Amino acid sequence: MDIVEIIKAIILGMVEGLTEFAPVSSTGHMIIVDDMWLKSQEFLGKYAANTFKVVIQLGSILAVVVVFKDRFIDLLGLRGRHRDGKPRLKLMQVIVGLIPAGVLGVLFEDYIDEHLFSTATVLIGLVLGALLMIAADVFAKKAPKAQTVDQITYKQALIVGLVQCLSLWPGFSRSGSTISGGVLVGMSHRAAADFTFIMAVPIMMGASVLSLLKNWQYFTIDALPFFTAGFISAFLFALISIRFFLKLINQIRLVPFAVYRIVLALVIYIVYF
């Protein structure tokens, strides 16, 4: 494996890291960067290339764990009980938010992989996701009941979990759907974003590990440098992206991302159709 292919791995990791947790659809960006330009399937093969995308997604997940490490320590009860009387996000609220998409994902995984992963379906997801995000900003409550993630209710967690099911459609965007759902049920943009990232870790980790176990044979000595470079790149760029996004989301809200998604959909449409 030569240096050019390692550079391609770094670029793909960068795209994954920058877009996985922003509400812009990492799938749509992979179509443009990989399918249209870098073409990893040509030198890795179809299944190894798909395994590589799972590996770099794990890099992005690790970045979330690093950014929210204190939160996960609290959720797992590793600090002991807090005695200040303040409300705090509970592990059970996260589980409630995970159940709907988790169940549907397991039931329809094969159908989604076989029938919904196409350029046309991603285009539809990009546009419909953008419309949902615009609606969320238009109808957002002026004084959200949950200003922080510690103030969300079980009902809000469940509704966000139900809306997250939309992200099973490729191109819709997990963060786009869940942040929109959170805003529509009375969370601030930052609270919804925090809850989105926290929920993403177990559901994405589970899906990624299962996929890797199914495709372990593609971890060859030849592919290892490519996989490693992509993983590290995705991790580093996801760290940057997550921290930047969380600082700005309450100010810029969702409409700018929605406009960007529509432009991206137009670019893909012009190139492919």
UniProtKB/Swiss-Prot annotation:
Broad class of enzyme this protein falls into: hydrolase
Record has Protease as a keyword: no
Topology with respect to the bilayer: Multi-pass membrane protein
Reactions mediated catalytically: di-trans,octa-cis-undecaprenyl diphosphate + H2O = di-trans,octa-cis-undecaprenyl phosphate + phosphate + H(+)
More about this protein: Bacitracin is thought to be involved in the inhibition of peptidoglycan synthesis by sequestering undecaprenyl diphosphate, thereby reducing the pool of lipid carrier available.
Function, as annotated: Catalyzes the dephosphorylation of undecaprenyl diphosphate (UPP). Confers resistance to bacitracin.
Name recorded for this polypeptide: Undecaprenyl-diphosphatase
